[in-house]
Amino acid sequence: MALDAETKKSIIDEYATHPGDTGSPEVQVAILTQRIRDLTEHLKEHKHDHHSRRGLLLLVGQRRRLLGYLADIDISRYRALIERLGLRR
């Protein structure tokens, strides 16, 4: 369930902290969040797709680690990001 190039580019443009930024925690978390949302929709229709379910759990864990890292280095950036993404309601 990879993102198409256009979607990925729009996410990078929206969450980049500076021009050419593709690796900041904000960009990585935003991309992972979109992949998680897409995979969640897929699993609503295909309930027995356990291979994709495992992939979803891996993505959630990776996003959680990145968010923890961001919270450790700059709590204000962390809070701004979870607000923009609609996480931790």
From Swiss-Prot:
One of its GO terms (molecular function) is rRNA binding. SUPFAM superfamilies: S15/NS1 RNA-binding domain. Pfam families: Ribosomal_S15. Gene3D superfamilies: 6.10.250.3130, S15/NS1, RNA-binding. Signal peptide: none annotated. CDD domains: Ribosomal_S15p_S13e (cd00353). SMART domains: Ribosomal_S15. One of its GO terms (biological process) is translation. Keywords: Ribonucleoprotein, Ribosomal protein, RNA-binding, rRNA-binding. One of its GO terms (cellular component) is cytosolic small ribosomal subunit. The keyword RNA-binding applies. One of the primary rRNA binding proteins, it binds directly to 16S rRNA where it helps nucleate assembly of the platform of the 30S subunit by binding and bridging several RNA helices of the 16S rRNA. Belongs to the universal ribosomal protein uS15 family. Part of the 30S ribosomal subunit. Forms a bridge to the 50S subunit in the 70S ribosome, contacting the 23S rRNA. This is Small ribosomal subunit protein uS15. It comes from Leifsonia xyli subsp. xyli (strain CTCB07). The gene is rpsO.
